[in-house]
């Protein structure tokens, strides 16, 4: 299994995790004890990271399947203790899944751009589909200026380039 340090040394993974949990979260990962399970309070004490930050980081990682917990109930008090461990071995799969989701959204946006004809109000800078523009007799509903045809080819070209780059990075071009 790859260590946290090795994972964080990868610029793409570091950027992804940094965006997800911030600098303090990264600091928690760097100081996270290897092996075993630890409560959020133990982690805060062992790492010197604020307890609220520890909890927020763990929940965020859990939402992405990069951390797991086991729940223990104290039979005397009824209190629950959550014992956490990292699952950063899943980071590549999680990243790929998110890239595929982004690709799906970009494909849908490209289809929308290619399927529709657009009109724009130069005064308000609002873009409308042909259907909406026709419903308003090609007058802006905000300022009543005439709508002009909007050429969205640059948007479509940019979307195609981005889609091609993503597919290439996924090995499915």
From Swiss-Prot:
Gene Ontology molecular function terms on file: DNA binding
Any single GO BP term: transcription initiation at RNA polymerase II promoter
Keywords, ordered alphabetically: DNA-binding, Transcription, Transcription regulation
Domain of life: Archaea
Keyword Transcription regulation: yes
SUPFAM superfamilies: Winged helix' DNA-binding domain
Entries under PROSITE patterns matching the protein: HTH_TFE_IIE
Keyword DNA-binding found: yes
All copies of domain HTH TFE/IIEalpha-type, residue ranges: 9-92
Notes on the domains: The winged helix domain is involved in binding to DNA in the preinitiation complex.
Biological role: Transcription factor that plays a role in the activation of archaeal genes transcribed by RNA polymerase. Facilitates transcription initiation by enhancing TATA-box recognition by TATA-box-binding protein (Tbp), and transcription factor B (Tfb) and RNA polymerase recruitment. Not absolutely required for transcription in vitro, but particularly important in cases where Tbp or Tfb function is not optimal. It dynamically alters the nucleic acid-binding properties of RNA polymerases by stabilizing the initiation complex and destabilizing elongation complexes.
Complexes and interactors: Monomer. Interaction with RNA polymerase subunits RpoF and RpoE is necessary for Tfe stimulatory transcription activity. Able to interact with Tbp and RNA polymerase in the absence of DNA promoter. Interacts both with the preinitiation and elongation complexes.
Sequence similarity: Belongs to the TFE family.
The protein's name: Transcription factor E
Species lineage: Archaea, Methanobacteriati, Methanobacteriota, Stenosarchaea group, Methanomicrobia
């Amino acid at each position: 299994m790859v260590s946290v340090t090795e994972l964080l040394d990868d610029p793409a993974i570091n950027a992804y995790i940094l965006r997800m949990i911030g600098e303090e979260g990264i600091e928690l990962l760097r100081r996270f004890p290897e092996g075993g399970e630890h409560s959020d309070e133990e982690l805060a004490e062992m790492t010197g990271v604020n307890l609220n930050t520890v909890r927020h980081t763990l929940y965020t990682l859990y939402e992405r399947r990069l951390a797991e917990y086991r729940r223990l109930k104290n039979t005397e008090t009824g209190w629950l203790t959550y014992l956490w461990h990292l699952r950063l071995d899943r980071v590549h799969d999680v990243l790929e899944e998110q890239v595929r989701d982004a690709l799906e959204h970009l494909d849908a946006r490209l289809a929308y751009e290619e399927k529709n004809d657009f009109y724009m109000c130069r005064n308000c800078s609002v873009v409308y589909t042909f259907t909406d523009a026709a419903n308003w007799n090609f007058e802006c509903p905000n300022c009543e200026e005439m709508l002009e045809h909007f050429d969205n080819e640059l948007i479509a070209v940019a979307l195609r380039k981005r889609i091609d780059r993503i597919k290439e990075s996924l090995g499915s071009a």
